Amino acid sequence: MRAMDTQVQSAERGLVLPPMNSTVSSATAATTATNTDTDTDGDRDEERESLAEDGSEWVPAYMLTRDRSRYLGHFLGVDKMLEAVKCKYCGVIIRRQGNSISMAEASQTHLWSTHKIDPNANYYSGWTGVEAGSTFMVRPPLKNHQGGSATTNSIANLLEIDEDFLKRTREKEMALPLVQSLAIIIASENLPLSFVDNTAVRLLINQNANSLSFIDHDLILNAIRSIAYNLDRIIQRTALRNNSDLSLIIDKNYLLMDPTDRSNQLSNRLKNQLFEMQKINFFSLSHSVWNNTISILSIQYYDDFHSQVKTLPLIIQNLHEYNNDPKLSIPAQLLKISQELPGLQNTVISITLPRSQIVDLLNVMDSQPFFPNTYTNAKNYYHNCIISIINSAILPLFGTPKSADITHPRQSSFSKEPLTLLDSLIDLSNIDISNSIFSRINSFLDDLQSNSWQLDKFRSLCEKFGFEFVCSKFDLSRYSTATVSLQTFLNLRPIIEEYQSSIQIEKFNEIDFQIIDYLLITLNSINRILKFFTSSKSLNFTYVLFAIMSIEKHLLSTLGSLQFQRLIAPFETFLSKIQEFKTILFSDDMNLLAMFLCPAILFEREVLEYSFHTISLSEIVDKLSTSIFSLLKRFLNLHTIGNVNNSHNTSNHSNMNIHTDNQTNNINNRSGNNSDNNDNEHDNDNDNHSNSNTPASRIDIDPTGGENSVLPEQQPQNSNNNLSFGSLSDTHHLSDSTISKEIDSIFLQIIQEDLYDYLSTVNSIVPISYRSYCEQSNFIRDSGRFKKRIITEDSIIGELEQPMNFIEELLDIHVPVCNAFWSQYLDNDAGPIIRILFKIMQCQSSSSIRGEYSFLNDFIPRVHPDLTQEIIKIKLFNDQFVASKVDYDLDTLQTASQYLP
């Protein structure tokens, strides 16, 4: 071990203070940082930092994890899960708490709020005595390897030094970080380069850099190009880091010949590898086109640190420049990614595209595969964008498709306001609304505004009823105006009814207002779905099928109450489209797996039977185990080294070079314990299933309920890859294929154990969670449906019960309860398979369109016309990261996420 700089140790607490002069305050420590990783900077002595206390040995936290975040250098830990860390400065122990901020965020907040220490400061670097309370960081002077400081070498004093040259050099070094910051600001805000020519800006620059000579337009342009290039390199480094965590290396020199002992060895090694897999950043891709001008192929991943889904553009192309160019095709773009970012495809789970693109792509990619050919179902890789599905299905509510034989006048937008996110999601450009209620409303408002006498009369009626007249017409180019127009017109109903009684016009009757009401309720609910799936919320891929089924139920319920054909026909067409797409989505194995990880679905008997053709959860586990095995086996690169040592026996077990951890030690008994409990509650007729629309009772978890299903430890010998532990042959020659089969058998068992543990936990927690959530949020359940309890101030009325449609139930009740379940489950006893699956589902793109890109609706680059791609990349990165603190030469996506503003 390397020696660490002189340290001061507290006698009372035995804490190791930072390697600094005793006269320097802790506030001074906040000012020091370097741009290198914790494991390469400074000298350290881990033994002197270690602390034995209450039977636990506290060691430097960075030694327990592969995470190289600098804040870890300021803490001690006791286990590799880092359930608790001890501050080296004050001895405070920070523990992982459920349903709270992450451990990393809590630790960094403690450093800054308590000790005024920058979490990005390197604990092991040199400390510079600047003024206490200073908020900027100072790099320590370079050391002369022959002794002394580079600035005190006597030989240097004998040299003739060009003072002007040194001054210019120092000015340039001081200006470069400022140029980078200016480049980030200009690109992120889409400012013109003339921004830096502003007198106030240049005065501010001069005060910070003491020089203006190096701040010019070319320097900023080069900085923008450099940052954008380095963003791709950050993704590249992340991909390489992912690949390093994929190798499962088995040293046959240490394998025991006894089948049972060898099974335990391989099981522990595999569980260790699964623990490492949890650190991988899984990715998904998506493609979208904005404003019919900008094509973007983006990457999406889940940020563990902030519990947020983040997205970054990979390829940005101007459609006007590449009109009908083969470079715009999805296969060409995927090929470009695999060439420029080698290794990235190894951890890309899928790509999400509009339905029309997927149909074309599946026929092409067979000959040019981007994903490995391990799945028999290609739909596992190519997901349908739920936004494009809804867009295609909802069009009949607005009118009929425009005829190609008829020339329709091009409508200009009524509003000068910027386009909203909703405007970019639904395209109505090919819809003829002439026979719809929207056309009637627009005609009424046009006639009203064209006659000043009628307009004055209408406004006087508005004043009489206490309304302010606002002309809210439906703009075909702005989908968001649909609900605004309907709601405004509905609010004006009493005024309209009185007005039209004295005017000879086509009158709005009761049916018209009912149509408006039905449309408004449906469109408001659909808009909530659209916003949900374009947000950065994690787990929204898990709710894709749930959302489609909720829309279907809402439409069926609405059609059951409609009595006029004018609205029945478009709603039936809408429903038919949704049901067609539902069938397509159910053919996607990844969607089925995602639905299984939505706890509320497990209580829906009809849904389970439709999805898996059985209501037996044990049979469902058997089916899903195979899918999960195929999915995760792709990320287990098995490598065997060495030869079997025949002299090894059970006494040599301690020589096995395998490290178990606290998480994996408790897994082995889960399935057995859960199965014993579940057997006592088993009912062969499955009468315990809830047939209501909501989780009202326990689900029946029966590991032996399936015709061919048994518990993992009860599996008979299988001549194929699935070998039970008892069938491992006692041979003196273990081939690679034999070891691979044994690993596969153990892997399958771990998968099934975790799935049964998940079902058992859902069974015990979710029903209680629904009751608790409804009580706290004023929801009540009546005959399988939810209602909102509204408490009024009227003593006679008391409280009202407001019915909820199926979409409202999904977003207001099911999603919050399921999210709370996952937060609690992951903070406690979730197994490694479930944790990996959860992370994979979090990274999946449910929509090819994300809200973060909505600024592209009317985007025009102001920096430079040739830097559109670079500007978009930097803006999106800066919106989601602290771009000014990122080390573009060293950071990965994981480490870049941990910088605090």
Curated annotation (Swiss-Prot):
Glycan-modified residues: 21, 242, 291, 540, 645, 649, 652, 662, 669, 673, 688, 722
Binding site for Zn(2+): 87, 90, 110, 115
Taxonomic source organism: Saccharomyces cerevisiae (strain ATCC 204508 / S288c) (Baker's yeast)
GO molecular function annotations of the record: G-quadruplex DNA binding; zinc ion binding
PTM info: Glycosylated.
Membrane disposition: Single-pass membrane protein
Superkingdom: Eukaryota
InterPro entries hit by this protein: RNaseH-like_sf (IPR012337), VID_Regulator (IPR052884), Znf_BED (IPR003656)
SUPFAM superfamilies: Ribonuclease H-like
Comp. bias (Low complexity): 27-37, 646-677, 718-727
Polar residues compositional bias, start-end: 1-10
Zinc finger (BED-type): 66-122
Additional observations: Present with 2950 molecules/cell in log phase SD medium.
Any single Gene Ontology cellular-component annotation: plasma membrane
Listed name of the protein: Vacuolar import and degradation protein 22
Spans traversing the lipid bilayer: 381-401
Source taxonomy: Eukaryota, Fungi, Dikarya, Ascomycota, Saccharomycotina
